[in-house]
């Protein structure tokens, strides 16, 4: 890393600004889901979520890991070469967007028949042109993260997410309870964000002349092709529970599932931002044969994440029903079982193994893990539906798979490169914090239920949260875990 780059800001500050952008992304998901689930009935809302599911599945499948290529290549290239690289990747993204748009339109009727929802055909045809607008937007995050200008990226995320949210929910509120209005709003937002993203991607290089990189396309596909298998596997893993629940349990249950299976915004804000900051750092260090020097940075990030995030995850697990009712309304109280089964996987998301795997060039290992995982998920989903077992067991199977994937990745990295991503210190701290949080969480659950009065979800969550941290912070001092310091660090850095 050169001196100019190193002076721009600390890694934590970069992660913090990136985290703010991530928070806006997931906050928009939360708020839009909360509003639409109240204005649309379960069938309409389920159809809307199915369209998003099909769209996101195809995008993930066809991108072949290209978004991470921005963070991987840019730190390795000179300024002029970076501009040529971005232009090359933009052309690839436009082509992929066109392919996805054609597939959505042509196969909309077939997809609707497979998922046994005739209304899907109309919705998919309306949404078919959107990939042409949304895919070229990919890369803004990778560019500004690699250039260590994440403050600008945070502003971009805040503005675009607020605008997207307004475009999606306003037509539904004004014109009526129909999912098509939300799709139309999404399309309008996509067009304006496309213009903004193109400006953002070109802005750092307006005074830079592009320098052609020899065999650039070959380099891009050499990097991304091994990831293709991994992302196909990852897409199939993601598709499995959505497909089986959508097809065999109905649109209404799918609405419950889709509302329950969502990440906690604050947790994803932290874990994703750390991953995105570490990837270019590890990539540069690996190119300089100095990756061991970053292990302390990695360990510090993981230890801080454990103390900061495990209490949030535990609280959400214990008070899942109140959270679902508060966000979506009493009608979606049944989403709590899906939410509880889903968020346990966020405990292993604290380990940013992906950054290390990619920096070490272990994309083939990543591919093999996900292909095996896809086979497991589809076999498990088939067995659960064939046995008429409850749908939440499919989500449990998916969460267990995420634990297995992280475990295998950590072992593979250690065997091949002797890099211990999970040491005794991390394991011990994780175990102690989880036990401490569970004890305080269930005790606060019991105490809050003994308090007489109004059991409105919002009030119950506030009271329970206060009791939870009143118990957690002093007990943390006994076991030498400073929970309050981890929170104050985030506030002070802001």
Region roles according to the model:
Residues 133-156, 343-375, 382:
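Membrane-interface junctions at transmembrane-helix termini in multi-pass inner-membrane proteins
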Residues 13-29, 160, 185-197, 201, ...:
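Transmembrane helical elements of multi-pass membrane transporters/channels
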Residues 37-44, 147-152, 162-195, 363-364, ...:
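Membrane-interface helix-loop junctions in multi-pass transport and translocation proteins
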Residues 1-7, 11, 179-185, 195-238, ...:
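Interhelical loop/hinge segments that connect adjacent transmembrane helices in multipass membrane
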């Amino acid at each position: 890393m050169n001196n100019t780059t190193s002076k721009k800001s600390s890694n934590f500050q970069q992660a913090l600004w990136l985290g703010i952008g991530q928070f806006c992304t997931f906050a928009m998901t939360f708020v839009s889901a909360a509003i639409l689930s109240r204005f649309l009935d379960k069938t309409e809302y389920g159809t809307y979520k199915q369209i998003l599911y099909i769209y996101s599945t195809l995008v993930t499948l066809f991108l072949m890991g290209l978004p991470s290529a921005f963070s991987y290549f840019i730190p390795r290239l000179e300024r002029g070469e970076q501009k040529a690289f971005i232009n090359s990747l933009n052309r690839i993204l436009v082509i992929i967007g066109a392919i996805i748009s054609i597939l959505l339109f042509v196969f909309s009727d077939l997809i609707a028949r497979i998922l046994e929802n005739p209304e899907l055909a109309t919705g998919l045809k309306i949404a078919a042109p959107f990939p042409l607008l949304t895919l070229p937007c990919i890369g803004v995050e990778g560019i500004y993260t690699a250039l260590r200008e994440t403050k600008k990226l945070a502003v971009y995320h805040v503005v675009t997410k607020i605008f997207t949210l307004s475009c999606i929910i306003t037509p539904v509120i004004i014109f009526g309870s129909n999912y098509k209005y939300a799709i139309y709003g999404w399309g309008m937002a996509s067009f304006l964000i496309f213009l903004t993203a193109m400006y953002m991607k070109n802005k750092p290089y307006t005074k830079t002349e592009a320098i052609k990189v020899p065999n650039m396309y070959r380099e891009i596909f050499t990097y991304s092709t091994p990831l293709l298998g991994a992302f196909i596997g990852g897409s199939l893993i993601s598709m499995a529970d959505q497909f089986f629940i959508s097809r065999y349990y109905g649109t209404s249950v799918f609405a419950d599932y889709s509302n329950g299976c969502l990440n906690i915004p604050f947790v994803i804000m932290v874990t994703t931002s750390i991953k995105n900051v570490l990837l270019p750092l590890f990539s540069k260090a690996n190119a300089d044969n100095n990756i061991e020097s970053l292990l302390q940075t990695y360990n510090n990030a993981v230890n801080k994440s454990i103390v900061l995030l495990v209490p949030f995850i535990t609280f959400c697990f214990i008070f899942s029903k109140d959270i679902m009712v508060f966000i979506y309304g009493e009608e979606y109280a049944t989403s709590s079982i899906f939410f509880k089964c889903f968020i346990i996987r966020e405990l292993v998301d604290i380990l940013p193994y992906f950054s290390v795997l990619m920096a070490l060039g272990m994309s083939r290992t990543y591919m093999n893990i996900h292909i095996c995982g896809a086979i497991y998920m589809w076999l498990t989903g088939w067995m659960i539906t064939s046995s008429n077992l409850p749908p939440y067991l499919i989500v449990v199977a998916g969460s267990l798979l995420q634990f297995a994937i992280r475990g295998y990745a950590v072992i593979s990295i250690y065997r091949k490169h002797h890099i211990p991503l999970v040491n005794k210190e991390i394991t011990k701290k994780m175990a102690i914090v989880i036990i401490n949080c569970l004890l305080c969480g269930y005790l606060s659950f019991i105490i809050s239920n003994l308090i007489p009065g109004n059991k409105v979800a919002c009030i119950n969550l506030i009271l329970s949260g206060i009791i939870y941290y009143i118990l957690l912070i002093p007990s943390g001092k006994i076991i030498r875990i400073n929970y309050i310091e981890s929170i104050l660090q985030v506030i002070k850095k802001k």
